[in-house]
Structures are given as C-alpha cells and as structure tokens.
From Swiss-Prot:
Gene assigned in the entry: murG
Segments crossing the lipid bilayer: none
Protein name: UDP-N-acetylglucosamine--N-acetylmuramyl-(pentapeptide) pyrophosphoryl-undecaprenol N-acetylglucosamine transferase
Localisation per UniProt entry: Cell inner membrane
Annotated disulfide bonds: none
Known role: Cell wall formation. Catalyzes the transfer of a GlcNAc subunit on undecaprenyl-pyrophosphoryl-MurNAc-pentapeptide (lipid intermediate I) to form undecaprenyl-pyrophosphoryl-MurNAc-(pentapeptide)GlcNAc (lipid intermediate II).
Pathway: Cell wall biogenesis; peptidoglycan biosynthesis
Species of the source: Escherichia coli O6:H1 (strain CFT073 / ATCC 700928 / UPEC)
GO-annotated molecular function: UDP-N-acetyl-D-glucosamine:N-acetylmuramoyl-L-alanyl-D-glutamyl-meso-2,6-diaminopimelyl-D-alanyl-D-alanine-diphosphoundecaprenol 4-beta-N-acetylglucosaminlytransferase activity; undecaprenyldiphospho-muramoylpentapeptide beta-N-acetylglucosaminyltransferase activity
Length: 355
C-alpha cells in the first residue's frame, strides 16, 4: 500500500510506553513513502528520542493535571487552550492527512486541534484501561483501537506494536524444548528498576538454590546494592545489570520472566513466547493489573499483586513450574500475541487518510 505524498502527524509523549509504539508505526509508514512529523513536549523523552529516528518533532507546552494543586487546576483551561492553539498552528503549517494519537498529555490538545481543522484522528490505547486523554478523544476520533480487550467497549483489539527483533525470535518449541539444568529466570524492573523486585528476588534465589539461574535487571543506580543483596543471601553467582540493551537476546536466554506489567512489557513477553510472573505496579487505576490479566486468563502467566507479594509466594510459584509447564505456558503466550500489530495500526491510519 503506497503512501507516497501522504502526511502523518504522530502525537505521543512522556513515556516509552507511548513513544516506542508510535515510532514502530512511523517507520512502517515511512517505508511506504509517508512523510511523518511528531507532536511532543520539549521536556520529556520524545524530545531526544524521536529526532534520533530521523523524524522532525514540533513542541507544545502541556503537562498532566492529576495530583496538581488548586491553582494549577484553576489555570488548566487556559493552559489547555494555549496548547490547543499551538498545536493548531503547527498542523495548519504541516497539513497532515491524518493524526495518530498514541497517548500522553500531548495527545489531548493535539487531537482537539486536528478535529477542529477537519483532520481525521486515529487513536491507539496501549493499556488495558484507557487513559483520561484517550477517553476524551475517543468521542471525536475517526477510529479507536486498543491493545487489550476492555479499555473501550467496542474498539478493535489490535495489540501493541512490538520491536522487530523480538518478533524475529524462534518459536517457544524451537527455543525451549530440550533445555536442561537450572531454570533461567529473567527479572526485569524497567529502566527505573522495581525496588520491590530488587528487595525480594535475592531472598527468592536463596530459597530456590541451584534450581535457578537469575539475570536481574536492577535499574539505574541499583546494580551495586542488588549484587550485594544476592551476595548476602549466599547467591553471588547470579548476574545483575543496570540495563539490558538487547532485550531480544535476554528473552531468548530466559525460560521465565519476573517483572512489572507495563503495556509494552506484556506485549513483548507474549510476542517472544515466554511464561511470566507479573507483579503489577500499584496504580490507582490498576492499569498494570488489567494489562497482565489476558495472559493470566490464557494460562500463560500468573499475577501476584504487590500487596500479596512475599518471598514464599514467588519462590513457591517458580518452584511449581516444571519445564514441561513452562513450555506449555510459553506456547500459550505466543498464541495470545498479535505479531502484526504495527501493520494493523498502520493500515487504519492509511484508511482514515483516504476516507
């Protein structure tokens, strides 16, 4: 499907969970001849990341309202109006055929600006429960898509765009069948780490002894303290790294993952075909719980909520999974994934631009 001469504006910012799926769709459409620009904010990660991908970015001034004081709430309508006006001026100059909202505060004024100019608005919700911005924009959007069922009652489920190196991993049967020795446990806390996993897993390692080998991604600034915790637990042999640059290689190594359940993490684990023990971040919307639930229902994962988390709960769960069980769970995870999510989102963008 040629997009020669077509123009897309991607609206996404704040966190990798919004930005990385947007980049995947942008690259897919650029390969078809589309021109792509980005709408973001100058003080969040998209400001540095997006230009590195060869995409020009325009900035508006906007931030979240949740948890702000009364003065900020009183000033909010004016701030939103100013952000809408900035976005509208940018879009009048660029003249996109369609805009794609991937979430983050920037999507709100950006989506309203596009709608006010008669530009089709396509939305993608990455999480199992819809964010406030997307809930508002869904009322004016041309097309609404969701990664997991339940965020919107009638939206099409298309999955989350996932990195191609993860999609290229061999299937679980090829990767895991015939593996012997200690079960390989990958612990992932995200770029900031997960303090609860950093505190719990060294003691889990002590309980499980030589039945497991652990690769623990501790997050920024935590490597030394986590290594020390493993050593104090009598388990200095396990590998601790601050970051994992090549997640596809880590997934290929692992037999099972212990991690938070951010939207992209859940989608990547399903695409890789891996069993998981999810410990959702305690958010008032229980967003990460809803992200993980489809894989638990599919028999591919177990959720332990943070309030229920203990060394025994994790150790007993991992000890109870034989290699045969892990392979079955891995195959169920892969079956529950949507490997062509990027193409599905890109196709809807193309369709909206032609409408």
């Amino acid at each position: 499907m040629s997009g020669q001469g077509k123009r897309l504006m991607v609206m996404a910012g704040g966190t990798g969970g919004h930005v990385f799926p947007g980049l995947a769709v942008a690259h897919h459409l650029m390969a078809q001849g589309w021109q792509v620009r980005w709408l973001g904010t100058a003080d969040r990660m998209e400001a540095d990341l997006v230009p590195k991908h060869g995409i020009e970015i325009d900035f508006i001034r906007i931030s979240g309202l949740r948890g702000k004081g009364i003065k900020a709430l009183i000033a909010a309508p004016l701030r939103i109006f100013n952000a809408w006006r900035q976005a509208r001026a940018i879009m009048k100059a660029y003249k996109p055929d369609v805009v794609l909202g991937m979430g983050g505060y920037v999507s709100g004024p950006g989506g309203l600006a596009a709608w006010s100019l008669g530009i089709p608005v396509v939305l993608h919700e990455q999480n199992g429960i819809a964010g406030l911005t997307n809930k508002w924009l869904a009322k004016i959007a041309t097309k609404v898509m969701q990664a997991f069922p339940g965020a919107f009652p009638n939206a099409e489920v298309v999955g989350n765009p996932v990195r191609t190196d993860v999609l290229a991993l061999p299937l679980p049967q090829q990767r895991l069948a015939g593996r012997e020795g200690p079960v390989r446990v990958l612990v992932v806390g995200g770029s900031q780490g997960a303090r609860i996993l950093n505190q719990t897993m060294p003691q889990v390692a002590a309980k499980l002894g030589d039945s497991v080998t652990i690769w623990h991604q501790s997050g920024k600034g935590s490597q030394q303290s986590v290594e020390q915790a493993y050593a104090e637990a009598g388990q200095p042999q396990h590998k601790v790294t601050e970051f994992i640059d090549d997640m596809a290689a880590a997934y290929a190594w692992a037999d099972v993952v212990v991690c938070r359940s951010g939207a992209l993490t859940v989608s990547e684990i399903a695409a890789a075909g891996l069993p998981a023990l999810f410990v959702p971040f305690q958010h008032k919307d229980r967003q990460q719980y809803w992200n993980a639930l489809p894989l638990e229902k599919a028999g591919a994962a177990k959720i332990i909520e943070q309030s229920q988390l203990s060394v025994d709960a994790v150790a007993n769960t991992l000890a109870g999974w034989s290699r045969e069980t892990l392979l079955t769970m891995a195959e169920r995870a892969r079956a529950a994934s949507i490997p062509d999510a990027t193409e599905r989102v890109a196709n809807e963008v193309s369709r909206a631009a032609r409408a």
